[in-house]
Structures are given as structure tokens and as C-alpha cells.
Amino acid sequence: MRLFISLPILIVVLAMALEGPAPAQATPDLASTFENLPDKLKEFGSALEDKTRAAIEHIKQKGILTKTRTWFSETFDKVKEKFKTTFA
């Protein structure tokens, strides 16, 4: 039963693959590629800038979290030592 179902699907996929690219998928000519190049570079630059800014903000916030965590642990250790010396 599986063979009867898979053979027609295989034939259709093979026919689509051998057909080649559709006209809309054809490679663009060199002139249109160079015309779109500045727009593509601006888009790439903007995306890179946004990602870089987001990464820097993440690092800054992560640094703040690390500093806060160390401050709390140091303060807790100091309080713990005071309790030990006071009540010992």
C-alpha cells in the first residue's frame, strides 16, 4: 500500500525538480543587482546596528545583575559574620 502512495509522489517531485526554476525565480541580471545593492547595504547596516545595540544593552544589564548579585552575597556574608561574632 505504501508503495502505491509513494510512487506517484516521487514522480511528481521528480517532475518538479527537473522542470527547473520558475521565471520569477530566475537569476536577476547584473544591472538590477547593482541597482539594489545600496538599498541592501543600508538594510544590512540597519539590521547589524540594531543587533549590536541590543547585544550591548543585554551585556550592560547582565553586568548590573552580576554586580547586584555579588553585592547582596557580600552583604549577606558580612551580616552573617556579625551575627557569629555577636552571638558566639
UniProtKB/Swiss-Prot annotation:
Q: Which Pfam families does the UniProt entry name for this protein?
A: ApoC-I
**Cell location:** Secreted
What keywords sit in the KW lines? Answer: Lipid transport, Secreted, Signal, Transport, VLDL
Q: Which GO terms describe its molecular function?
A: fatty acid binding; phospholipase inhibitor activity
- Keyword Heme recorded: no
Example GO CC term: the record gives: high-density lipoprotein particle
The region annotated as signal peptide is 1-26
What's the superkingdom here? Eukaryota
Q: Which InterPro entries match?
A: ApoC-1_sf (IPR043081), ApoC-I (IPR006781)
GO terms (BP aspect): lipid transport; lipoprotein metabolic process; negative regulation of cholesterol transport; negative regulation of lipid catabolic process; negative regulation of very-low-density lipoprotein particle clearance; triglyceride metabolic process; very-low-density lipoprotein particle clearance
Q: Which family does the UniProt entry place this protein in?
A: Belongs to the apolipoprotein C1 family.
* Functional summary from the UniProt entry: Inhibitor of lipoprotein binding to the low density lipoprotein (LDL) receptor, LDL receptor-related protein, and very low density lipoprotein (VLDL) receptor. Associates with high density lipoproteins (HDL) and the triacylglycerol-rich lipoproteins in the plasma and makes up about 10% of the protein of the VLDL and 2% of that of HDL. Appears to interfere directly with fatty acid uptake and is also the major plasma inhibitor of cholesteryl ester transfer protein (CETP).
Protein name per Swiss-Prot or TrEMBL: Apolipoprotein C-I
Q: Which organism is it from?
A: Neotoma lepida
Q: Which gene encodes it?
A: Apoc1
